[in-house]
């Protein structure tokens, strides 16, 4: 280990593994360490099931009705991939797709007035949906056509809207959309967690709705993908990539000290040895004195023996409970997957309810989601602090990732990756040179 590296990475969470992979591909000499004996850090998938019970201190362990423990891979952090989103682009660029198999998530649902409705995925579905009345549908359709045609580089498509100055609230007003449709659009399509976006310039929201539509157009049923065997496969895929390009991996490796000289990182000490480096990437757990708390997320993992009611017996789905529907500031999310994804025993389903904590009683906050899941065989409750770095790392050359937020997709994680890359490399992370690999995640060439 006593060697000189360009970059040392601590922790094998998804953010760290993707950056390690990209740095290795770019010719950097990388050492990647993790104090845990497994990959994934906060974003790992726990197997066998007995391990999950131990982790949550449920002493009696799983009953026989749960099937074989090793048939389970339970994600600690529930997220799906947007089919046309940034993480899929990163997977394609790096060809990490060859190590993974994906399934399309069967449906996306939204909560309204105590019931759940399918988020319409085609114009036909939108016209048949009970989410809105007839006149509302026509106005909504006009709005969707406007969004689909909108091109920030072509003022002819603006229809009097200024992408940098017109607020999203004003765009909704222009199309005369009612509150329910606004909730649905902002939270189930643009995937905002709160309503703060309403008074921001509309371009970001328009692009988010476009991402949703383009992701949906890719495979049909929903815009989301999920890897067989769980999300823990993602960091491992990027770790393999790093190793192929010469990266060195060490699991179960305690980190004794991060060595600084004149305020700048020069190495990492482990078990009496020092590995030197020019730059360091890590997750917040490795540098508690350089991060600040930015809130909390509650995640409740629920094991079910049945599909969720009113989802058409889907073996995977997402449910969004918009904050307005339950008098909150932040949305509540449910991600559900099952034995169909090789993450649970035959006939079993895993539903994870999560939200940003707003009160002193977080479990009460997710009750509307849990009611949709009854009966629940077993619950595992996790309340996690969210951390972010206190500085940008430009002086210390220590670059820390942010904790994984309550969103049910990886777009915010990818923004963090691009941001860290830019701070480390001094130039923007460029997707353009990724277009060499024009295949989709199922290995079919784009037409």
Curated annotation (Swiss-Prot):
GO terms for biological process: negative regulation of axonogenesis; negative regulation of protein targeting to membrane; positive regulation of axon extension; positive regulation of toll-like receptor signaling pathway; protein transport; Rab protein signal transduction; response to calcium ion. GO terms for molecular function: GTPase activator activity; Rab GDP-dissociation inhibitor activity; small GTPase binding. The keyword RNA-binding does not apply. Keywords: Cytoplasm, Golgi apparatus, GTPase activation, Phosphoprotein. InterPro entries: FAD/NAD-bd_sf, GDP_dissociation_inhibitor, RabGDI. Coiled coil: none annotated. It is found in: Cytoplasm; Golgi apparatus, trans-Golgi network. Gene3D superfamilies: FAD/NAD(P)-binding domain, Guanine Nucleotide Dissociation Inhibitor, domain 1, Guanine Nucleotide Dissociation Inhibitor, domain 2. High expression in brain, lower in other tissues. The modification Phosphoserine is found at residue 427. SUPFAM superfamilies: FAD/NAD(P)-binding domain. GO terms for cellular component: axon; endoplasmic reticulum; Golgi apparatus; midbody; myelin sheath; neuronal cell body; presynaptic cytosol; protein-containing complex. Interacts with RHOH. Interacts with the non-phosphorylated forms of RAB1A, RAB3A, RAB5A, RAB5B, RAB5C, RAB8A, RAB8B, RAB12, RAB35, and RAB43. Interacts with RAB10. Belongs to the Rab GDI family. Regulates the GDP/GTP exchange reaction of most Rab proteins by inhibiting the dissociation of GDP from them, and the subsequent binding of GTP to them. Promotes the dissociation of GDP-bound Rab proteins from the membrane and inhibits their activation. Promotes the dissociation of RAB1A, RAB3A, RAB5A and RAB10 from membranes. This is Rab GDP dissociation inhibitor alpha. It comes from Mus musculus.
């Amino acid at each position: 280990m006593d060697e000189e590296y360009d970059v040392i990475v601590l922790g094998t969470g998804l953010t760290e593994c993707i950056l390690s992979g990209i740095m290795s591909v770019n010719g950097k000499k990388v050492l990647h360490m993790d104090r845990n004996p497994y990959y994934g850090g906060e974003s790992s998938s726990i197997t066998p099931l007995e391990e999950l019970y131990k982790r949550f201190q449920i002493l009696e362990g799983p009953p026989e009705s749960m099937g074989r423990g090793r048939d389970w891979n339970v994600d600690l952090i529930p997220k799906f991939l947007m089919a046309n989103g940034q993480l899929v682009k990163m997977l394609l660029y790096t060809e990490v797709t060859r190590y993974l198999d994906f399934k399309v998530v069967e449906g996306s649902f939204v909560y309204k007035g105590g019931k759940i409705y399918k988020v319409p995925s085609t114009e036909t579905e939108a016209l048949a949906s009970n989410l809105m009345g007839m006149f509302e549908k026509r106005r909504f359709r006009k709005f969707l056509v406007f969004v689909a045609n909108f091109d920030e580089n072509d003022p002819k498509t603006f229809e009097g809207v200024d992408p940098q100055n017109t607020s999203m609230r004003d765009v909704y007003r222009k199309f005369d959309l009612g509150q329910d449709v606004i909730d649905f659009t902002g939270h189930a399509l643009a995937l905002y967690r709160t309503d703060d976006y309403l008074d921001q310039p509309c371009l970001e929201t328009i692009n988010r709705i476009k991402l949703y539509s383009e992701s949906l157009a890719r495979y049909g049923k929903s815009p989301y993908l999920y890897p067989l065997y769980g999300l823990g496969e993602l960091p491992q895929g990027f770790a393999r990539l790093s190793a192929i390009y010469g990266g060195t991996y060490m699991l179960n490796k305690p980190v004794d000290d991060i060595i600084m000289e004149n305020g700048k990182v020069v190495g990492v000490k482990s078990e009496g040895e020092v590995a030197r480096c020019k730059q360091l990437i890590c997750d917040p757990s490795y540098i508690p004195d350089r991060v600040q708390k930015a809130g909390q997320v509650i995640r409740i993992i629920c094991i079910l023996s049945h599909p969720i009611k009113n989802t058409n017996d889907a073996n995977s789905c997402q449910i969004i409970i918009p904050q307005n529907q339950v008098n909150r500031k932040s949305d509540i999310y449910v991600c559900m997957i099952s034995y169909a994804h090789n993450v649970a025993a035959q006939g079993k389903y895993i539903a994870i309810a999560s939200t940003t904590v707003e009160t002193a009683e977080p479990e009460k906050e997710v009750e509307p989601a849990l009611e949709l899941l009854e009966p629940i065989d077993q619950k595992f409750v996790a309340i996690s602090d969210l951390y972010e770095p206190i500085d940008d790392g430009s002086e210390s050359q220590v670059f820390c990732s942010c904790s994984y937020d309550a969103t049910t997709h990886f777009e915010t994680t990818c923004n963090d990756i691009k941001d860290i890359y830019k701070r480390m490399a001094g130039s923007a992370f460029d997707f353009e040179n990724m277009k060499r690999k024009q295949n989709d995640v199922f290995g079919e060439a784009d037409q």
